[in-house]
Every structure is written in structure tokens, then in C-alpha cells.
Amino acid sequence: MSIRCGDTLLFQTLPVIAAGAAVGGKKEGEGPLAAEFDELSADNRFGQSSWEAAETYLQLRAARLCLQKAALPQEKVQLALAGDLQAQCTASSYAMRELGVPFAGLFGACSTMAEGLALGAASVSYTHLRAHET
């Protein structure tokens, strides 16, 4: 359970990030953070026929890498929070459908990452506290 202090949520049990993964294209590979990516491709379309398909591949590949690093089978995922800048979270929807996990699409433009972290933390906190009731 969280306590609200103004616009801030304070969690009694701190949420954790068990794993993360990042996949990037040519520009990311040329940048100063290239070594931080799990996978880079010189082909900005990752062998896909369109930008939309490439964005779907990016999300799917990053999700699979993250699950692998966390040693978590996809069947154990109860909810995925994901977003992209395509109309109605197209890439996210296709990637999560292929992964076969429950999905909530986020569209906040530049705030999507922060939105996902906040919603994820609140969801984990609530679920953790209610677990004793089942």
C-alpha cells in the first residue's frame, strides 16, 4: 500500500526492478551509451519490412531479453506496461500480443517511461499487500 504525500506516493515496501534490457539501432550504436545496450543493429529496421514492424521487433526483443535476464518465464507475467509513439500503441500491442502477456498500453509521449514506472510500482505494491488475503 502506498501513502500519498502531495503528488508523491510513498511505498511501505519499496518496489524493485529485477532486470532491464535495451535494444538499439545504428544511431544508438554510434552514441556514448552504446556499451549500455544489450543488443545493437546497424540496420535501423532490424531486417523488418517497415518502421512499424521494426518498432514491434524492438519491443519484443527487449521484453524477451529482460525476461531472460530476470529468469522469469513469460507465463508468470501478470501485467506488462508498455508504450510507444505510434498511433494507439501499435508496436507495443503487437509485441505484447506475440509475447502472450496481459498488457496495458501507455501513451504519454516523453512521459511514458515515468508513467510506466509509477503505475508498475503502485500495482506491485497493491498486489504484494493483498497477497495474504488469498
Feature names for model-found ranges:
Residues L72, A122-Y126:
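Secondary-structure boundary motif
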Residues A62-C66, G116-S123:
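Buried hydrophobic packing segments
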Residues G83-Q88, C110-S111, E133:
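Acidic, glycine-rich active-site loops and adjacent beta-strand->loop/helix elements
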Residues A104-C110, A114-L117:
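Cysteine-centered functional microenvironments
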Residues M1-A104:
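Conserved "HGTGT" condensation-loop signature of ketosynthase/thiolase-family condensing enzymes
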Residues T127-T134:
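Conserved small/polar residues in nucleotide/adenosyl-binding loops
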